[in-house]
Amino acid sequence: MLNKLKKAALVGSGLLVLAGCSSESADDASVNSEAVGAERLVVGLDDTFAPMGFRDENNEIVGFDVDLAKAVGERIGAEIDFQPIDWAMKETELDSGNIDMIWNGYAITPERAEKVLLSEPYIVDAQSIIVLKDSAIETKADLEGKLVSTQQSSSSVDKIMEDESGIFGKLGGDLVLYPSNNNAFSDLESGRVDAIVVGEVYGRYYMKQSGKDIYRVLEDNFGEDEMAVAFKKDNKELQERVDAALAEMKEDGTFDEIYDKWFYSE
């Protein structure tokens, strides 16, 4: 069964391929275009945001988005440099020309769409419900009377409390809140809670790193955010080249190879 992250990738791939077939600009944006030439493009990122972009034990910037950007760079004939930035100033850095792209788990919002030019969404981060594989919980409604854990002060808390199903008022107790999602996973594994709610991107990364095949992600969730690459409003040419490269990567399996390196799949 495809998880939501991969489903989003396949949907995005189809949209991009259709766009490439129907638009004259796609020819100009071909990832094999000789006109591209060698160039350097700067990606702005928060280098503490695992698994999208962060520093490893050797202080090297690594991550899912980092690997994607490098692969895209190879296809469009560009060297990709990664520049840590103040995340609160990311759009300012882009507008000033200090960076060419924001590529770091950048969620699409109406406000952001007014400020920047966005790529096609390439991944979805759901507020996922995660249980142990042998759990009887199959849907959001099954959380009634159950203990649920999540990270304190996270968007997950608000999503659970505001969910239109009203499940928050039917839980088997107060939300069990911890400083980090890692604590929530520990509670789930030990049986102290019945389910946890966490962003799917981080959740699947954690499960991949744990090496334990004991978890199950429900189809039901508490909402979804699409992620995209951001460009300056007037940089349509770069947007089209990146979109075309990502579409090719989804078609030829490169995207899945990078995905499977970083994320857990059932």
Identify the meaning behind each predicted range:
Residues 89, 106-114, 161-162, 187-190, ...:
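A ligand-binding cleft/hinge motif common to bilobed small-molecule-binding domains
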Residues 28-105, 252:
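Extracytoplasmic small-molecule ligand-binding "clamshell" domains
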